[in-house]
Amino acid sequence: MSGEPGTDIAEVIRSLMREVPDFPEPGVHFKDLTPVLADAYGLAEVSRAIADSARGADLVAGVDARGFLLGGAVAVTLGIGVLAVRKGGKLPPPVLGETYTLEYGSATLEVPADGVELAGRSVVVIDDVLATGGTLAAAHQLLTKAGANVTGAVVMMELTALGGRAAVDPLEVTSLYSV
């Protein structure tokens, strides 16, 4: 663990993340956040920083899959619930879904259509990375369709060169670390 108490959250993330050249293909410089989440101090600091941005929410919505880890930790910190925004086909019916476009195809996000009342609730969406913005935009649209008031989103890392903020505009996004 290389973070020190009082260290800037971006520095904590940068110091703990692993950089993997040429993954998943040549020329890509992959930023692996797994070591940040596996480090007790790193997880605690990231969770606290996200919780600070999500204060006032009735519910946090963690996006499949690492958003689940972050969302759960943040919900406990804030004393509120967490909703798992799942990849398609993982929840029993009935579900509400939102399909979005990927580079080579499409994907779907889902939430329960009943059993969890979302109408009128103030929700902050939590995910690990903002890249092109497709997943975050779909989560926002899905939760809005379910009647939630999505007040913002928080991501651990933003890949600014991929322009994800434009895809989620006008949703307010807080990023703890940008590259």
UniProtKB/Swiss-Prot annotation:
Single GO term (MF): adenine binding
Protein's GO biological process: adenine salvage; AMP salvage; purine ribonucleoside salvage
Keywords carried by this UniProt record: Cytoplasm, Glycosyltransferase, Purine salvage, Transferase
InterPro entries (alphabetical): Ade_phspho_trans (IPR005764), PRibTrfase_dom (IPR000836), PRTase-like (IPR029057), UPRTase/APRTase (IPR050054)
Annotated pathway: Purine metabolism; AMP biosynthesis via salvage pathway; AMP from adenine: step 1/1
Entry's localization field: Cytoplasm
Keyword rRNA-binding: no
Alphabetical list of Gene3D superfamilies matching this protein: 3.40.50.2020
Reactions accelerated catalytically: AMP + diphosphate = 5-phospho-alpha-D-ribose 1-diphosphate + adenine
EC number per UniProt: 2.4.2.7
Function: Catalyzes a salvage reaction resulting in the formation of AMP, that is energically less costly than de novo synthesis.
Family annotation (PANTHER family): ADENINE PHOSPHORIBOSYLTRANSFERASE
Family, similarity comment: Belongs to the purine/pyrimidine phosphoribosyltransferase family.
Subunit-structure text: Homodimer.
Protein name, as recorded: Adenine phosphoribosyltransferase
Gene: apt
